[in-house]
Each structure stands twice: as C-alpha cells, then as structure tokens.
Amino acid sequence: MVVMNRIRVSKRVEKKLAKGLVLLEASDLENVNLKDQEVEVQGQEGNFLGTAYLSQQNKGLGWFVSKDKVVFNQAFFETLFRKAKEKRSAYYQDDLTTAFRLFNQEGDGFGGLTVDLYGDYAVFSWYNSYVYQIRKVISEAFRQVFPEVLGAYEKIRFKGLDYESAHVYGQEAPDFFTV
C-alpha cells in the first residue's frame, strides 16, 4: 500500500473541487512544500476529499484527480485509457479520421497528460515532471489498451530536461506520412 502525504485545503478550495474545478493553483496550496508526488487531499476539518498530485507546470501546481483513494499504477491508467478509447469509438469507425486526441488531460481524468494519434503512431505529451516520472507506468498501460498502435513518441512540455521529444516504443514512424 502506498502511503501518501496529506494536504489540507481551505473551505474555498473545497468548494472549488466540489464544482469540478480540478486544477490546483498556488493560491490553493498555501504553505505546501511538497512536489512531484501523489497526495491525499483533506478538507479544513480533516475530512477526506480525494487524491491529487502536485507538480509545477505552466498552469498550476497540480491536479485533483479523484474523489476516491486511488494509486496511480498501471491498472488505474488502463481504466482511464479504456474509458477514453470508448468515448472515441466513432473516430475509429471513420475511415477519413486518422488523427485525433486519444486522451485529453483532465477531461479524461488525469491532468498533465495528453496522447494524440497520428495514423498508427501515438504522441504522449508530458506537461510536468511528475507525469514524466511515471511515464513508464503510463506507457505500459497505454500499450495494453491500444495494442494496435505501432509505435509512440513523447513531447516534453515542461522545462528541465535536455531534450524535447523522443521515440518511446515500437516501430519508428516514417519521416512523412499522410493523416
């Protein structure tokens, strides 16, 4: 079992989360010195609100992910990817659609990550260092749910690494192809 640090948020942030606003901003997390990790979110009275992760990115300091106690493991991401795939089933049936977003951050249940499909190849975009840290778990879950994808690449959308894109797994895409 994973032991998570806990953060306590104000009534204002409790209301924000209850409305479904899941981006955690600096003003939401006063006096929190944690970063790049999962956290349990508690209300002002110490009541459990859900699970989030903290990691600096262009917008915000983290994401509230679930009202449940969850662990960001392969099974968790497989579930998210299955739901996302089901939502986009119409795109798979349309022969004229060969490029689309397979997974769209908080809209699919996990802010800080997008996955786009171009033909038979996926592109993961990591928007913060925490998501990048767990990229192997994410990509393995993805491979289980999307075995038809021939290969994948990654785009780094945050500062701190010495590269911006790389091949992740599978076949390499041709230099040029039509989508």
Language-model segments: residues:
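Short amphipathic alpha-helical segments
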Residues: 73-80, 130-138
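Non-catalytic substrate-recognition/targeting regions of SAM-dependent transferases
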Residues: 103-110, 114-116, 132-179
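Non-catalytic accessory regions of SAM-dependent methyltransferases
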Residues: 1-117, 166-169, 174-176
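Divalent cation-coordinating acidic motifs and surrounding scaffolds
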Residues: 120
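Structural motif
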Residues: 125-129
